[in-house]
Amino acid sequence: MAGLNSLEAVKRKIQALQQQADDAEDRAQGLQRELDGERERREKAEGDAAALNRRIQLVEEELDRAQERLATALQKLEEAEKAADESERGMKVIENRAMKDEEKMEIQEMQLKEAKHIAEEADRKYEEVARKLVILEGELERAEERAEVSELKSSDLEEELKNVTNNLKSLEAASEKYSEKEDKYEEEIKLLSDKLKEAETRAEFAERTVSKLEKTIDDLEEKLAQAKEENVGLHQTLDQTLNELNCI
């Protein structure tokens, strides 16, 4: 009779452990569903979500290992039910393993909460980046407008240079004694043309690199400043050339 009571007690413990294992599996499935939802949110994040992907992957791997351990525990529980008369010590071993699984499930819950927090933080950072991008796009448009103004000024200088070239050509027929001065003027015009081509090349380079937002804006502003200095130099050179022509 005592043996039957002991067997019944062992069976009740096995059933209790079976229920604990089922509950743990239900919780793992619930965690898996929540994790799937977090994965969908994670896929929408950009840039800063790379670190989050790794941490969620670690949580998934931990959940997979927990499910494998639960399956092993269930198998051992079935074996224990068939051999319930072996020893009470074997039951204690199973109880200890179930407790360890419970502790690991609590750790997984903490990891899941942390993953949710990281996902929310990634969403916030993405919104900040989006706002910053709007601001940079506005600055980029203004920089492009300044570049267009610089190109218009370069066109005006080119027209002035053509006029000077025409004046110099008309002076070539005046007298051979001015040939040395005319050669000097032609050399100055060539230098001015080279500077103008260099300014146009820099403007084209600025347009090709405009996609690099913040760095491009800084580069454009620097090139615009250089273009202004070159334009001032060109005006000074042209004024000097015209003055020399007037003095001939």
Curated annotation (Swiss-Prot):
A Pfam family matched in the record: Tropomyosin
PROSITE patterns for the chain: TROPOMYOSIN (PS00326)
Region ranges (Disordered): 18-49
Keywords associated with the record: Acetylation, Actin-binding, Calcium, Coiled coil, Cytoplasm, Cytoskeleton, Metal-binding, Muscle protein, Phosphoprotein
Chain positions found as Phosphoserine: 6
Modified residues (Phosphothreonine): 216
Database matches in InterPro entries: Tropomyosin (IPR000533), XRCC4-like_C (IPR014751)
Chief location bin: cytoplasm
A Gene Ontology term for the protein's cellular component: actin filament
Top-rank lineage group of the source organism: Eukaryota
Gene Ontology terms, MF aspect: actin filament binding; identical protein binding; metal ion binding; protein heterodimerization activity; protein homodimerization activity
GO biological process: actin filament organization; muscle contraction; platelet formation
Regions of compositional bias (Basic and acidic residues) in chain numbering: 33-47
SUPFAM superfamilies, sorted: Tropomyosin (SSF57997)
Coiled coil region boundaries: 2-248
KW Phosphoprotein (keyword) present: yes
Entry's localization field: Cytoplasm, Cytoskeleton
Entry annotated with the keyword Nucleotide-binding: no
Modified residues (N6-acetyllysine): 177, 215
Sites of N-acetylalanine modification: 2
Entry comment, domain topic: The molecule is in a coiled coil structure that is formed by 2 polypeptide chains. The sequence exhibits a prominent seven-residues periodicity.
Family: Belongs to the tropomyosin family.
Record's subunit section: Homodimer. Heterodimer of an alpha (TPM1, TPM3 or TPM4) and a beta (TPM2) chain.
Function: Binds to actin filaments in muscle and non-muscle cells. Plays a central role, in association with the troponin complex, in the calcium dependent regulation of vertebrate striated muscle contraction. Smooth muscle contraction is regulated by interaction with caldesmon. In non-muscle cells is implicated in stabilizing cytoskeleton actin filaments. Binds calcium. Plays a role in platelet biogenesis.
Protein name per its UniProtKB record: Tropomyosin alpha-4 chain
Gene label: Tpm4
